[in-house]
């Protein structure tokens, strides 16, 4: 559709929504959500940050919750560790994420972080599993036509067609 092509061109011509610090934080979070393993690459290998940046330009309703969530996360780390999320040690990053990653176990004072993390986790998973790396990771091959083996023998027998010759 022409409208879709124009919209895609418009979105791709917009500057990046996230600043450098936000991008680095999102990349770090993405790799904690989907790390590289022996089967596939990480969220950053799949360029999930570019997907998320595209989505927030296409669906502006994500902008405030994501930017606000990133600020919330940095403030939590600054208050606890005196550093931003990306400057915090790996165990400190995981400590914060453990408190917001499981919605049914979240303390009331961490609710805002849990809402942010849930949205981000969904975007990271969507970005990853719609990338070439993610598609390969799940073994998706797309629509493949079935192989025609001819009319099954039981159907031929049912209609008394077992003596009929097919082909040339």
What does each of the following model-derived ranges do?
Residues 1-2, 89:
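N-terminal export signals
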Residues 9-11, 23-28, 47-168:
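Mature-region segments of soluble proteins
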Residues 2-46:
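Immediate post-signal-peptide N-terminus of mature secreted/exported proteins
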């Amino acid at each position: 559709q022409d409208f879709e092509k124009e919209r895609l061109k418009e979105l791709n011509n917009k500057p990046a929504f996230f600043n450098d610090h936000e991008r680095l934080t999102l990349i770090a979070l993405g790799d904690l959500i989907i790390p590289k393993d022996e089967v596939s690459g990480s969220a950053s290998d799949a360029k999930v940050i570019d997907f998320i940046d595209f989505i927030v330009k296409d669906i502006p309703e994500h902008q405030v919750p994501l930017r606000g969530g990133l600020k919330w996360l940095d403030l939590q780390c600054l208050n606890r560790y005196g550093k931003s999320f990306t400057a915090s040690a790996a165990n400190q990053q995981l400590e914060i994420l453990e408190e917001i990653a499981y919605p049914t176990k979240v303390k009331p004072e961490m609710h805002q972080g849990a809402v942010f993390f849930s949205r981000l986790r969904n975007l990271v998973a969507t970005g990853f599993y719609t990338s070439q790396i993610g598609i390969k990771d799940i073994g998706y091959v797309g629509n493949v036509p079935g192989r025609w083996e001819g009319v099954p023998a039981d159907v031929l027998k049912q209609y008394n067609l077992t003596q009929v010759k097919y082909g040339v």
